[in-house]
């Protein structure tokens, strides 16, 4: 493994452990030419999100959407940043304008469900969440603790008691 690839792999590992400063150190040691790589941008984005630096993260996610318009990841992250900045209606719109490949991701349906719940659109929320749970049953466990779904908690539990 070349040094840049080793550093990128190390940075990914640090992000997974929540060690954002260490991940940034690995990325900082990369040659300048590597900073434009999609995987490096994604790791930087995850660091910003982990540090709750939502505006910077959104700007980087939007850049990723422009660079990789067919890839769903940038759209999911950008919408999440908007939601965290209390711009949930914009988050819904952003995801709605994303590529068709988004609709293959359970995270798309889960996040749409959360955003609709936050806006009080409970029936729409439940429909999106049900689709997410069909695609990835583990999301049901996550939903039990998700504060965005507090208003729907009893209905979600009743559906699968």
Task: Give short role names for the model-derived ranges.
Residues 16-17, 50, 84, 118, ...:
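Register position in tetratricopeptide repeats
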Residues 134-161:
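Terminal, low-structured helical/coil segments at or just beyond the last alpha-helical repeat
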Residues 31-32, 65-66, 99-100, 133, ...:
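A conserved position within tetratricopeptide repeats
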Residues 117-141:
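TPR/TPR-like (Sel1-like) alpha-helical repeat modules
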Residues 9, 43, 77, 111, ...:
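"A position-specific structural signal for the A-helix of alpha-solenoid helical repeats
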Residues 3-33, 42-50:
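Alpha-helical segment of the N-proximal tetratricopeptide repeat
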Residues 39-107:
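Alpha-helical adaptor scaffolds
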């Amino acid at each position: 493994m070349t040094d840049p690839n080793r550093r990128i792999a190390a940075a990914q590992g640090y992000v997974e452990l929540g060690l954002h400063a260490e991940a940034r150190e690995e990325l900082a040691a990369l040659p300048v030419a590597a900073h434009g790589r999609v995987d490096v941008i994604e790791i930087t984005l995850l660091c910003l999100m982990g540090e709750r630096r939502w505006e910077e993260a959104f700007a980087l996610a939007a850049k990723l959407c422009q660079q990789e318009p067919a890839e769903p990841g940038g759209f999911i992250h950008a919408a999440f940043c908007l939601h965290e900045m209390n711009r949930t209606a914009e988050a819904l719109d952003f995801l709605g304008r994303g590529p068709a490949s988004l609709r293959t991701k359970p995270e798309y349906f889960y996040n749409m469900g959360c955003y609709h719940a936050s806006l009080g659109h409970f029936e729409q929320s439940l429909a999106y969440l049900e689709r997410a749970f069909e695609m990835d049953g583990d999301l049901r466990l996550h939903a039990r603790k998700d504060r965005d779904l507090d208003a729907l908690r009893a209905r979600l539990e009743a559906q699968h008691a």
